[in-house]
Every structure is written in C-alpha cells, then in structure tokens.
Amino acid sequence: MSALVYFSSSSENTHRFMQRLGLPATRIPLNERERIQVDEPYILVVPSYGGGGMAGAVPRQVIRFLNDEHNRARIRGVIASGNRNFGDAWGCAGDVIAQKCGVPWLYRFELMGTQRDIDNVRKGVNEFWQQLPRSA
C-alpha cells in the first residue's frame, strides 16, 4: 500500500480521524513555513474550509503543498472532510482538488468521521491501491 498525506487544522478533527484509521500517513505542517515533499504516490486527506463556499475551501497549507510540482505529480486521489452544515459545499475541497489535479474524489466524511467512515476508508484505500497500475 502506498501513502496517505493529510492536513489537519488546530481543531485536530482530521488528525483524530487519521489516528483512528491507523494507516501510515504524513501530515502537512500547520506552520506554512515548514515544507514537506512526498516521494511516492499518495492519497490526500483534506478538510474543507470557508463556511460553505468554494472560495477558500482548500486550506492554504494544502495549496502550497500541491503547488510544489514534485508533490502534485504524485497525488493519486483525494478524500475530503467537512461539515454537513455547509450544505452542497460539504467536503468541497475534495471537488476542487480532484478537478485541479485530475484525480478521483474517493470519499468524504463529516468532522472526525464515524466508525463506518473509518471502515469504508480503510477498505476503499486498500482496494484503490490494488486496482491502480503499478506505474501510476
């Protein structure tokens, strides 16, 4: 299985989800001055921001991470979290990233996710990597 990369704000909702998921993962730093590079294909797990609009939905740290060509070339899919209070824009950061990076939007969950979300993501991530061509 390949990597998961995620961002979590200071609310730590996405971080708690990732801890419960129990799969190897790299966190995009909260501090925008810190940078990371990922050297293998990965699925990005990202919260949605902005109170329900598309503008500002993707966290700045994630934009900076994906603006690095090295990182952008290795993204293979996206999983988004959000708040159902955002209505149609729930998890819309996943939409934005999938469209801009040309990768599938694999799943979305609310806030810290439920046990069902954890189970679905574990299963889905495993199946995704098994179906993806080795050269991808």
Swiss-Prot record:
Q: What molecular function terms (GO) are annotated for this protein? A: FMN binding
The record ties this protein, via InterPro entries, to:
Flavoprotein-like_sf, RNR_Ib_NrdI_bac, RNR_NrdI
Gene Ontology terms: biological process? protein modification process
Extract the Pfam families matched here.
Flavodoxin_NdrI
Would you say which domain of life the source belongs to? Bacteria
Q: What stretch or stretches form a coiled coil here?
A: none
Role: Probably involved in ribonucleotide reductase function.
User: What family is reported?
Assistant: Belongs to the NrdI family.
Name the record gives this protein: Protein NrdI
Q: Which organism is it from?
A: Salmonella typhimurium (strain LT2 / SGSC1412 / ATCC 700720)
* Source organism phylogeny: Bacteria, Pseudomonadati, Pseudomonadota, Gammaproteobacteria, Enterobacterales
Name of the encoding gene? nrdI
